[in-house]
Design a protein with these regions (language model features):
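Bacterial Sec-dependent N-terminal signal peptides
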Residues: 1-33
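Alpha-helical protein-protein interaction scaffolds
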Residues: 29-88
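Contiguous, well-ordered beta-strand patches that form the walls/edges
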Residues: 34, 104-113, 129-196
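N-terminal helix-cap/turn-to-beta initiation motif at the start of protein domains
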Residues: 84-100
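Short consensus segments that form the blades of beta-propeller domains
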Residues: 113-116, 199-201
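Short, surface-exposed charged micro-motifs
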Residues: 122-124
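Edge beta-strand at a domain terminus
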Residues: 189-215
């Protein structure tokens, strides 16, 4: 009987080479991720120091997602939490007060006097630090009719996301809110709905409403 021959060095070398290539590639990719994460973090810090909190938040979000287990990843998460609170306080300060709904188009897009004649009542929202009051006001009698009251609840898909101005209502609808620089126009867009099966994201034909500040 022939004895089994031991694998020769020539047979071992290709296998060793393949393993080394795989390991080297993994190390290189890891180094690239680390370098990219560091660059995003440092850029975020520079925007943070300039008080450009929106750009800083977006960059900290990117840095936190690349390698969340690193010190930079953990530090980015802490900055995200801080910046969300800062930005929410800023937009809430702008939002406090009473707003009149003008429709699904911004102020400059239509003649408000003409569209206003079609309705018997105007729709309003009154925003406080903790609640949103929806009500109607009859144009002739000036009588107010409360539609509903909602708690002001911010929505986060996850802790590391960069969303800070999304709110969720009791029916599960999620609305992105934005206010112009003069703090007199509010725009809300229905971006999703939370159900028992999770969050359904709305990416087209989104319901959109515009408000002007009256008080």
């Amino acid at each position: 009987l022939q004895k089994n021959k031991k694998p020769t060095t020539k047979m071992k070398n290709p296998l060793l080479l393949i393993v080394l290539l795989i390991v080297s590639k993994a190390i290189a990719q890891n180094d690239q991720k680390t370098a990219f994460q560091k660059s995003r973090y440092e850029l975020a810090v520079s925007y943070y120091k300039k008080a450009d909190f929106k750009k800083a938040l977006d960059l900290f979000h990117i840095a936190s997602r690349i390698k969340p287990e690193t010190e930079i990843g953990k530090e980015s998460m802490q900055k995200i939490d801080t910046l969300k609170n800062v930005l929410r306080e800023a937009i809430l300060t702008q939002a406090l007060g009473t707003w009149k709904m003008i429709g699904d188009k911004p102020v400059w897009a239509f003649n408000q006097k003409e569209t206003g004649k079609e309705k018997e009542s105007d729709e309003f929202i009154a925003i406080t630090p903790s609640e949103i009051l929806f009500y109607e006001k009859n144009k002739k009698t000036q009588e107010k009719k409360i539609i509903k009251t909602e708690s002001l609840v911010y929505y986060n898909k996850d802790a590391s996301d960069s969303l800070y101005s999304d709110i969720i209502l009791s029916d599960g609808t999620i609305w992105n809110c934005s206010i112009n620089e003069d703090s007199d126009q509010l725009r809300v867009i229905n971006v999703g709905k939370k159900t028992d099966n999770g969050v359904e994201k709305i990416e087209s034909n989104n319901m959109e409403l515009f408000y002007v500040k009256v008080k």
